[in-house]
Structure formats: C-alpha cells, structure tokens
C-alpha cells in the first residue's frame, strides 16, 4: 500500500493512501456477500437473495459507499502502523465522498486523502531556553509570621469567659437573636424578611466579618439590649431576598463572651509542639518560616521561567490536545468548587452553553500549559535529563503512603512522578542559566506572574487515583 505524507497546519498530517485493486475487490465482494446474507427483500428467504437482486434493490451507490467506508477504516489503520505515525484523535476524510462513490471501481486501485492531528514537536530557536530573562517576586522572611502563628494557636485554645460588667467590644463573641425588616417610607422597620431570622447566633466581633455595619452596630451594646442596625447588602449577595437592598436588622444581645488567651510560656510550647520551652519553639518556627520564604521565592522564579518558556514555543498545537487540556482544566475547576462546598451539578445543569463557555474561557491557559509542557519535554530530551529509577521509586513510595487506602492506578502514578521529577530537574537547570530579576513581594500582578498552586500536586494525584472500574 502506497502512502504519501503531507505536513498540514495546526500539527496535522495529511495522508494520501493508494489502496490496491486487490483490496478494493476483496472488500467490495465481502460487502455484497454480507448483504445477501442479511438483507430482507419480500419474496425471498433471508440469506437466499440473489446477488443481482441485492445490487438492484439497494443500488450501486449504497454498496459502493459501504465498501469505501470499510476500505477507509482498514487503510487508515494499516497506514498508521506502516508509517509509525504518532496520531492523536480521529481521522477526517479530505476526499469528497460523493466523488469517491462515482469513481470507485472494485477492479481498480482507489486513492483516498485523510488528515489527523499528530503529537507535536516543540519548535523553538536553538538554545533560546538558555537565555531566558524574567522577573519574579522575592518573598522576605518576616518575624511577624512567628507572632501570627503563635496568636493563631492561642486563639484555638482560648477560653470563652462570660462578660457582664461592660458592653461588647471588638474581639468578643456575641450571642444574639436577630431578624431583618424592610425599610418603611418613614425609615422605620417595615415588613419582616422571613428568610433572615435566627436565634442564639454566634457573632465574632471582628472587622470584615458579615455584612458591613453589623459588627460596628453590635460593638457598644449591653447584654439584653435590643437595637435596630441599618445595613445595605451588596448586589452580589447570594440571598436574593436581600441582595442590593437596604435592610434594618433587629439585634438582641443575649450574651457576651471574652476570649481569654493562654500565656505564651513553656507550658504553652509543650502543648502545641514537641519542644519544652518557648525559646526552642520560636527558634524552630523562625527556621521554618525562613525556609518557607526561600521556597516561595524559588517557586516564583520557576513559575516566571515556565511562563517565558512557553513563549519560546513557535510550533503548532493540534486541536485535539487543546480540547483535552480544556476538559482537564474545567474538571479541575469543578473539583475546586466542590471543595468550597458548592454544588457543581447546578452549574452544569444550566446547559451545554455554560459548559462550552467554561471551556472557551480556559482555552488561553490550556494553550499556555501545552506549550510549556512541550518545551520542557524537548529540553529534557536535548539535555538528556531524566530521573533515576531510585528517585521515581522513592517518590512513588512517598505518594502511596500519603494516599494510603486510596485506589491508585500504578501506571498513571509512575507516569505522573516521572513527568513531575523531569520537570523539576529541567527547571533547576534553567534556573542556573536564566537571568531573573527579583522584585519586592506584591510588585507583580497575578497576570504577570503565575504563583504555583499549593494544591497542584494533590490535584494531580487525585487524578491519578480517579480510576473507574471500566479501566
């Protein structure tokens, strides 16, 4: 079988396949024989219909079309195997089907033209990846991080002490009954809003909590005092009954509790850590936060390099890969929304238009991801970078332990680990070559520097775990 390849745009390959006459005749005869055995024609027993009658009743065009479709499928499979093509996705017919039917002769060769996406090769200027210049934010260690951590642990272990001799203050926990009312024309409480009512509700009196005005209104109230607090709800508030509305909240303060924090002493250090003294704990925390700042800076540098790396890619991307990456990003978004407690099924019940919008919106990110991944693969090949078997085994063992009890597809786990370790090694090498300007934290907007997601690896492992029973 003669196969001629043609490179097409968008990482496609065109094939011109010349099917020999022997194959055409064999398939055509098999189609006719199958039809004589299966077709139902009045006046004839099933399987006993003469060949001429079958051709007359069904028509040459139908029989030719059936034979051609079978020839196309068979010849494509043979061509892919013969030419060792890295095909992704399905083939499309470039020849005109009606014309093929007209010219088809079972006694003669048949030439068809098809096209398919192929796995792309990274195209880039030679050694351009050795000359990357980028900007990244430098994360500086702050002693405040230690103080904030200790304060957080204090608050977790705070004792709630009833307050009776003073009004509510910021930092207190207030227990309230509340109801909401529409604002009447005279500015007084009008009709009650049934959806907004509660009793024995705990309100932590901190700035930024709840709808603006509630906390400020409660601060200064005494126990058993009732007060009307005017509030304006934001337009995007999830409860439709009050979204964008001016509302009067009737608040009755039933209890005030003060958060009494434990002393930051050696006993506290023993309670929250493995250390016996507060000095030891603070020293360890300082070391941890210094290392964390260094790691975040390193992550920022690598993220900046990855973004620049994708920009060096000059080749074409196949549509099949772009669609697959869009699907992956939409699925990842759905997982993130579910983690936030949102009902993703409601989002997708809005119809195919909503799903397509999500895919369209993810397309730029999908393209950027693919370009970067292809460049990393090309550099790994060029620089002969790959993890050792021992490194892969060690990381796989760590992840198996981390996700102990979960169902894991071993093949996908190994592939994921090999890919992530290779990427890490490539980025370490690029970091040595790159000229990266470090800027103060907050200097770059999110669009200029992509900060790595702390959950990225976890999501990848979740994907590794998601093996259906059908696989």
Swiss-Prot record:
Coiled coil spans: none
GO cellular component, one term: cytoplasm
Keyword Secreted: no
The EC number(s) this enzyme carries: 5.2.1.8
Boundaries of every PPIase FKBP-type domain copy: 171-262
A biological-process GO annotation: protein unfolding
Enzyme class: isomerase
Keyword Isomerase: yes
Domain of life: Bacteria
Keyword line: Cell cycle, Cell division, Chaperone, Cytoplasm, Isomerase, Rotamase
Composition skew (Acidic residues), residue ranges: 447-471
Region entry Disordered, spans: 440-471
Catalyzed reactions per annotation: [protein]-peptidylproline (omega=180) = [protein]-peptidylproline (omega=0)
GO molecular function, one term: protein folding chaperone
Compartments in which it is found: Cytoplasm
Function according to Swiss-Prot or TrEMBL: Involved in protein export. Acts as a chaperone by maintaining the newly synthesized protein in an open conformation. Functions as a peptidyl-prolyl cis-trans isomerase.
Notes on the domains: Consists of 3 domains; the N-terminus binds the ribosome, the middle domain has PPIase activity, while the C-terminus has intrinsic chaperone activity on its own.
Family to which the UniProt record says this protein belongs: Belongs to the FKBP-type PPIase family. Tig subfamily.
Protein name: Trigger factor
Species the sequence originates in: Synechocystis sp. (strain ATCC 27184 / PCC 6803 / Kazusa)
């Amino acid at each position: 079988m003669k196969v001629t390849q043609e490179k097409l745009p968008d990482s496609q390959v065109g094939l011109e396949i010349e099917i020999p006459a022997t194959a055409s005749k064999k398939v055509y005869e098999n189609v006719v024989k199958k039809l004589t055995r299966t077709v139902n024609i009045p006046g004839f027993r099933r399987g006993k219909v003469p060949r001429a009658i079958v051709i007359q009743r069904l028509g040459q065009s139908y029989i030719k079309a059936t034979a051609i479709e079978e020839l196309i499928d068979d010849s494509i499979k043979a061509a892919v195997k013969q030419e060792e093509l890295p095909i992704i996705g399905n083939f499309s017919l470039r020849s005109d089907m009606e014309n093929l039917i007209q010219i088809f002769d079972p006694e003669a060769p048949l030439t068809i033209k098809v096209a398919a996406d192929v796995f792309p090769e990274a195209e880039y200027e030679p050694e351009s990846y050795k000359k990357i210049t980028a900007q990244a934010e430098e994360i500086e260690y702050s002693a405040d991080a230690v103080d904030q951590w200790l304060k957080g642990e204090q608050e977790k272990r705070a004792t709630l002490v009833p307050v009776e001799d003073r009004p509510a203050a910021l930092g207190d926990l207030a227990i309230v009954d509340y109801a909401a009312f529409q604002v009447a024309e005279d500015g007084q409480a009008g009709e009650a809003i049934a959806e907004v009512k509660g009793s024995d509700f705990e309100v932590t009196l901190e700035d930024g909590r709840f709808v603006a005005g509630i906390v400020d209104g409660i601060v200064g109230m005494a126990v058993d005092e009732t007060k009307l607090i005017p509030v304006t709800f934001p337009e995007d508030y999830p409860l439709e009954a009050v979204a964008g509305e001016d509302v009067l909240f009737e608040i009755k303060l039933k209890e005030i509790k003060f958060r009494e924090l434990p002393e930051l002493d050696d006993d506290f250090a023993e309670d929250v850590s493995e250390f016996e003294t507060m000095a030891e704990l603070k020293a360890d925390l300082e070391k941890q936060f210094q290392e964390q700042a260094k790691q975040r800076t390193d992550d920022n540098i690598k993220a900046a390099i990855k973004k620049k790396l994708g920009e060096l890619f000059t080749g074409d991307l196949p549509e099949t890969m772009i669609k697959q990456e869009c699907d992956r990003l939409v699925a990842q978004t759905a997982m993130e929304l579910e983690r936030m407690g949102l009902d993703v099924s409601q989002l997708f019940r809005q119809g195919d238009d909503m799903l397509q919008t999500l895919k369209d919106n993810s397309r730029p990110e999908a393209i950027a991801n693919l370009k970067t991944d292809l460049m990393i693969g090309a550099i790994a090949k060029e620089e002969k970078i790959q993890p050792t078997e021992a490194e892969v085994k060690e990381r796989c063992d760590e992840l198996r332990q981390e996700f102990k009890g979960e169902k894991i597809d071993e093949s996908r786990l190994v592939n994921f680990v090999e890919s992530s370790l290779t990427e890490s090694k490539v980025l370490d090498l690029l970091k040595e070559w790159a000229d990266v300007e470090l800027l103060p934290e907050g200097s770059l907007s999110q669009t200029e520097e992509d900060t790595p997601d702390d959950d990225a690896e976890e999501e990848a492992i979740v994907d590794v775990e998601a093996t259906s029973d059908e696989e």
